[in-house]
């Protein structure tokens, strides 16, 4: 009794073979630079980007020219071909050694062990130039493959999945709170995602009236004025006030004649006369003299 259908196994084997054949298809590199998948076999005469002057297509042409130069100038030697199941097995050799007619398998052949690693001949210069060009093309092909497959960097995908998990937790918590409705459940404000667009785009809150009142009643800074220069009129006014205070001390009553100072001697009568004259001038100026 058969447990599996042999027809389905045959169909699966054919599908695997067809998939393997599709994976082995080679496409035109110039068309790949412009986002088109065109099989390379027999496509060169009909390629619309055959003379494209862009940087990527220029690298393709430079590599073709370098391969032609190396094939014409290097010493040809026929390596022993190996076959497996009727197909040739790829057995790469060191490019620098092959340019000088020496066949050394590339596997296990480090650059420090190569005898032509410091050679600066024309062939080795072409080999190094082609190596750098191939590295740039491989980097370009990988980026193109990632863009075609729609792959994103792992960091972005992890962050995206983490954000989705957080959103699911928030939705689950809010739904459970609505169903249970207990006071021990967390509040919606605590379960809301702080990075949601509604919160990030909220307008700024208006200031409270109390804060505005305090802001309006703030004391102004004390002004500092420059010193006023003393003019002659102010000086004379101060002298008159000082003289008036002296005369008032000497003569308390207005109608009484100003007496001589008790401490003035006979030899200093002139000083008393001057003070009496000042007193009379004071009374005359202010209209107090009869």
From Swiss-Prot:
What's the protein called, per UniProt? Protein male abnormal 3
On induction, the UniProt comment says: Negatively regulated by lin-41 which causes degradation of the mRNA encoding this protein.
Q: What PROSITE patterns does the database record attribute to this sequence?
A: DM_1, DM_2
Q: Name its GO BP terms in alphabetical order.
A: cell differentiation; negative regulation of transcription by RNA polymerase II; nematode male tail tip morphogenesis; positive regulation of nematode male tail tip morphogenesis; positive regulation of transcription by RNA polymerase II; regulation of transcription by RNA polymerase II; sex differentiation
The record's section on InterPro entries has: DM_DNA-bd, DM_DNA-bd_sf, DMRT
Q: Which residues cross the membrane?
A: none
Residue ranges for the DNA-binding region feature of this UniProt entry: 28-74, 94-142
Chain segments carrying region Disordered: 139-167, 179-202
Query: Which controlled-vocabulary keywords does the entry list?
Result: Developmental protein, Differentiation, DNA-binding, Metal-binding, Nucleus, Repeat, Sexual differentiation, Zinc
Lineage: superkingdom: Eukaryota
Q: Where is the composition biased (Low complexity)?
A: 182-202
Reported function: Transcription factor which binds the DNA motif 5'-[CGA][TCA][TA]ACAATGT[AT][TGA]C-3', probably as a monomer. Acts partially redundantly with the transcription factor dmd-3 to coordinate tail tip cell fusion and retraction and thereby regulate male tail tip morphogenesis. Promotes male-specific development of two tissues, the peripheral nervous system and the intestine. In the peripheral nervous system, directs differentiation of sensory ray neuroblasts into peripheral sense organs. In the intestine, causes repression of vitellogenin gene transcription.
Q: Name one GO molecular function term.
A: RNA polymerase II cis-regulatory region sequence-specific DNA binding
Q: Where in the cell is it found?
A: Nucleus
Could you name the Gene Ontology cellular component terms for this entry? nucleus
Compositionally biased spans, kind Basic and acidic residues:
146-155
Tissues/organs with expression? Expression is undetectable in hermaphrodites, but persists in males. In males, expressed in cells of the tail tip.
């Amino acid at each position: 009794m058969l447990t599996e259908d042999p027809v389905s196994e045959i169909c699966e084997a054919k599908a695997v073979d067809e998939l393997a054949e599709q994976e082995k298809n080679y496409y035109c590199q110039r068309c790949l630079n412009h986002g088109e998948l065109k099989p390379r076999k027999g496509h060169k005469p009909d390629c619309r980007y055959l003379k494209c002057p862009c940087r990527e297509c220029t690298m393709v042409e430079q590599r073709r020219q370098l391969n032609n130069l190396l094939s014409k100038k290097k010493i040809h030697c026929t390596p022993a071909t190996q076959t497996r199941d009727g197909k040739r097995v790829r057995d790469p050799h060191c490019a620098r050694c092959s340019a000088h007619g020496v066949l050394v398998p590339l596997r296990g052949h480090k650059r420090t062990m190569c005898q032509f690693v410091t050679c600066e001949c024309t062939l080795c210069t072409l080999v190094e130039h082609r190596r750098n060009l191939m590295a740039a093309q491989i980097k370009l092909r990988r980026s193109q493959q990632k863009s075609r497959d729609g792959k994103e960097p792992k960091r972005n995908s992890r962050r995206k999945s983490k954000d989705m998990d957080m959103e699911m937790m928030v939705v689950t918590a809010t739904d459970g709170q609505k169903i249970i409705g207990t006071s021990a459940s967390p509040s919606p404000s605590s379960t809301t995602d702080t990075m949601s667009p509604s919160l990030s785009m909220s307008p700024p809150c208006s200031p409270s009236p109390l804060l505005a009142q305090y802001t309006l009643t703030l004391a102004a800074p004390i002004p500092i004025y420059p010193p006023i220069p003393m003019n002659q009129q102010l000086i004379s006014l101060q002298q008159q006030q000082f003289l008036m205070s002296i005369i008032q001390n000497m003569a308390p009553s207005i109608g009484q004649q100003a007496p001589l100072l008790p401490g003035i001697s006979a030899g200093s009568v002139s000083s008393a006369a001057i003070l009496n004259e000042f007193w009379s001038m004071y009374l005359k100026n202010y209209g107090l003299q009869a």
